[in-house]
């Protein structure tokens, strides 16, 4: 599967450490920057140190510690991690998704973007929307620490993309942390989508609603849970009519409004970090969203570890919806 990534760019035999590489502007540039750090993804999507003798990914995994200075280690990690988004974007496109630049009235170089399949959503029979958490992650990522320390499959949304495609879903992938662009010598907020909340609101109002999908499911990780609740509050009629399943993975969110609690308790479930086996019920009140174990104790692992249970839940909810019609 990940051999396709190696075909995009094969690391050169010689490489040097770059002291201050900027974030890459495309996938090839990102892979070159990784090579300058001495790393490359192997055919299984695992980030490994490049063997100087062969120029190919070797056996050694990523090492966080490059210095006795903790600040220098973190600086090195952040610079390397800055190369991840463009690689993931390219993989989304290789898996059949297309970019849509937002807001629509801005030039691409001053816009954010989302990914979808098909390129223009229209009356989807089944639509799956993926919403990541806060921080540095961009479209297609759940946890960049897992991408760097484990594999692309562990930390990206690509396993969700592939499973959704197998099950016949159209796809929409948000990019809620992509809120600024550098020009005129500084970082500038992107007009109309300058915060995560504004980003998902714009996407919902200008892409999802006009597309008039028949049935919608959402998977939202961490702060994506709060963004989803905000959407429910802004577009309650659409949600209650069309959104049949909401899968949270260790969501960071407050209590839903009283008027939406019954609906959310019916369609939503939260897979939380827990030391109990996958799907084990976790304590909750009768008036709250169902919470079950994601099968892992760490927050950043929950989307990866719960994927089979998440899709089982979504498919069962879709079957219930279909049987009501």
Swiss-Prot record:
Gene Ontology MF annotations: serine hydrolase activity
Any Pfam family: Arb2
Protein name per UniProt: FAM172 family protein homolog CG10038
Family stated for the protein in its record: Belongs to the FAM172 family.
Record-level GO BP terms: regulatory ncRNA-mediated heterochromatin formation
Originating species: Drosophila melanogaster (Fruit fly)
SUPFAM superfamilies according to UniProt: alpha/beta-Hydrolases
Source organism superkingdom: Eukaryota
GO CC terms in record: nucleus
């Amino acid at each position: 599967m990940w051999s396709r990534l190696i075909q995009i760019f094969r690391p050169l035999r010689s490489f040097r450490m770059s002291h201050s590489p900027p974030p890459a502007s495309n996938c090839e540039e990102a892979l070159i920057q990784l090579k300058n750090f001495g790393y490359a993804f192997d055919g299984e999507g695992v980030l490994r140190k490049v063997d100087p003798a062969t120029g190919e990914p070797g056996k050694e995994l990523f090492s966080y510690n490059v210095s006795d200075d903790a600040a220098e280690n973190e600086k090195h990690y952040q610079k390397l991690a800055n190369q991840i988004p463009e690689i993931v974007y390219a993989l989304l496109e290789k898996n059949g998704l297309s970019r849509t630049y937002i807001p629509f009235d801005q030039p691409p170089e001053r816009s954010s973007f989302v990914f979808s399949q098909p390129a223009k959503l229209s009356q989807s029979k089944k639509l799956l929307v993926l919403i990541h958490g806060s921080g540095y992650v961009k479209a297609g990522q759940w946890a960049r620490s897992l991408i760097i320390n484990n594999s692309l499959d562990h930390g990206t949304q690509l396993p969700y993309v592939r499973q959704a495609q197998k099950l016949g879903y159209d796809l929409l992938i948000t990019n809620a942390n992509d809120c600024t662009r550098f020009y005129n010598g500084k970082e500038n907020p992107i007009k109309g989508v300058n915060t995560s909340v504004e980003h998902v609101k714009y996407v919902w109002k200008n892409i999802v609603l006009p597309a008039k999908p028949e049935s919608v499911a959402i998977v939202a990780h961490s702060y994506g849970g709060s963004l989803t609740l905000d959407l429910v509050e802004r577009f309650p009629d659409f949600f209650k009519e069309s959104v049949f399943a909401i899968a949270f993975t260790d969501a960071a969110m407050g209590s839903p409004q009283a008027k939406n609690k019954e609906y959310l308790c019916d369609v939503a479930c939260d897979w939380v970090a827990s030391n109990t086996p996958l799907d084990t019920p976790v304590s909750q009140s009768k008036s709250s969203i169902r919470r079950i174990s994601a099968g892992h104790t760490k927050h950043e692992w929950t989307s990866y570890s719960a994927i089979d249970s998440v899709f089982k839940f979504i498919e069962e909810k879709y079957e219930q919806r279909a049987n009501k019609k």
